[in-house]
Amino acid sequence: MKKFQLFSILSYFVALFLLPMAFASGDDNSTESYGTVIGIDLGTTYSCVAVMKNGRVEIIANDQGNRITPSYVAFTEDERLVGEAAKNQAPSNPENTIFDIKRLIGRKFDEKTMAKDIKSFPFHIVNDKNRPLVEVNVGGKKKKFTPEEISAMILSKMKQTAEAYLGKPVTHAVVTVPAYFNDAQRQATKDAGTIAGLNVIRIVNEPTAAAIAYGLDKTDTEKHIVVYDLGGGTFDVSLLSIDNGVFEVLATSGDTHLGGEDFDNRVINYLARTYNRKNNVDVTKDLKAMGKLKREVEKAKRTLSSQKSVRIEIESFFNGQDFSETLSRAKFEEINMDLFKKTLKPVEQVLKDSNLKKSEIDDIVLVGGSTRIPKVQELLESFFGKKASKGINPDEAVAYGAAVQAGVLSGEEGSDNIVLLDVIPLTLGIETTGGVMTKLIGRNTPIPTRKSQIFSTAVDNQNTVLIQVYEGERTLTKDNNLLGKFDLRGIPPAPRGVPQIEVTFEVDANGVLTVSAVDKSGKGKPEKLVIKNDKGRLSEEDIERMVKEAEEFAEEDKILKERIEARNTLENYAYSLKGQFDDDEQLGGKVDPEDKQAVLDAVEDVAEWLEIHGEDASKEEFEDQRQKLDAVVHPITQKLYSEGAGDADEEDDDYFDDEADEL
């Protein structure tokens, strides 16, 4: 059946559906089952989790005591690592250590910037039906993961961090995304949450969340602020009005592919070229050497925020040769100046879109670790002619705001007077005759929103129309991003231009789009599309499978942890026995020489067993060895106590069981 495109025939009507509060109110019955809702900043390079309790926001430290966690996942021969542990071993395991996954989520393999990303990653990216998948070695076998699955592993780490702090399970979360993330990237982020065992009840734009962190205590007079959010991999600018707890986004712009990683890569490439030229080699082919260089360049960049120069030293960098170069702040700025200046374009755009002058901006809020770069601050402050605000922590502000949003949704104390009115970042529309982009909802429209428009058929007796949905600012659809498409069938035969087909776009508070179409004659079957599968999104079956696999990984992690704990318990016990029975001032001087030797021999047997089987033994085997050791020791200590030796009855026995986590 031939399909034809649409053309607009009537002036459209608007049914603007804007709730007075973009947040769910605290007394909404639907919030009762949420429990504690956490706020997660799922960053390109670092992630952060926070919670609102008793009117206060707590940034939650991870198991290493750090308030931000590297967005890294790694696979070794026998375990999966997430966070610091994954990042620390990255230089020695580059092909199986995944980072910057946010640059892949919700994207197609054939996108323009994808080839550049793939070239810069030490791990393998493969094409699966135009979806980028990460291929790594897991337990000696090749395994492919979607970006959603890797992101889910990071979200799961954040979930576990929150649960350890709260002492109870967490099932609901607010997760932030760059304001300029498109529909596919937002949906993919929600899917990642589902795989991680989290119901993502709201997606919040990162600069908007940061604005909450900035303006929560500023309720006196209306302010216009610009949030300049330059993170590890993405860049957003939002212009907001803040007035008595109402946060209204007036305009947003940005670049989902610009951030600190790009600055690092420029320096890495510069230093690699310099090293190659001096030594007549090609170090870029050595992934481990490049991993070491990446690690040191990131450190150097941070140092240059407070120093004018830094010495980069790497022992045994390549072919046994050391690396030693000085990097000055001036050189760093020279290498990246075009990227720094590029960040001012979106700033100009939000001023233009909101019809505000520079002089009408009350404050500039810096968010994201890359805003610590002195030249970035200098360019921005020069543009506005005023100093930027440094009153909030750029690494934690987004998670802070997400936690406040979470508090509102769950009805937490102190959150009832907060209202957030966000906007969509890109124009939404459909393709009509001639490949024209007919716009239904313009960019920077407040959400949630709903808009309808009447279209008709292009030829006589047309009974099916193809509705193609796009996002973007260009006149022709070929220059914009296709979100999805569907057919409206069963239109009664009629001359061209007679049927009335109502197309409705609805954007929810998460910025997620639903499109519906209906023949106004009432004879055609209504059709509805939640934009998803046409962009390579995960199907429900995919998500269910990945949830199951994530649970299996969690079970494997649990088994591994228990095995390690059992081994540590055995080693600690044997070590304590050896120390006690080797020392004549302790138990060694209180037992018969034969008994002493029996214990020391048993300890030696355990040490030899650990040497042979320690890497492969199961939890049960470690526990069995402990019991065998007990069988030797217990009768001896019992005999000692029955003879009156030892002043504290079972104190010595308790001592052997005294364990502490080893660093």
Curated annotation (Swiss-Prot):
Renumbered ranges of motif Prevents secretion from ER: 660-663
GO cellular component: cortical endoplasmic reticulum lumen; cytoplasm; endoplasmic reticulum; endoplasmic reticulum chaperone complex; endoplasmic reticulum lumen; membrane; nuclear membrane; nucleus
Signal peptide positions (record): 1-24
Keyword Endoplasmic reticulum among record annotations: yes
Entry's EC annotation: 3.6.4.10
PTM entry text: Partially N-glycosylated.
Main location: endoplasmic reticulum
Keyword set includes ATP-binding: yes
GO biological process: chaperone cofactor-dependent protein refolding; endoplasmic reticulum unfolded protein response; ERAD pathway; IRE1-mediated unfolded protein response; protein refolding
InterPro entries per UniProt: ATPase_NBD (IPR043129), BIP_NBD (IPR042050), Heat_shock_70_CS (IPR018181), HSP70_C_sf (IPR029048), HSP70_peptide-bd_sf (IPR029047), Hsp_70_fam (IPR013126)
Glycosylation sites: N29
The protein's name: Endoplasmic reticulum chaperone BiP
Lineage: Eukaryota, Fungi, Dikarya, Ascomycota, Taphrinomycotina
Gene: bip1
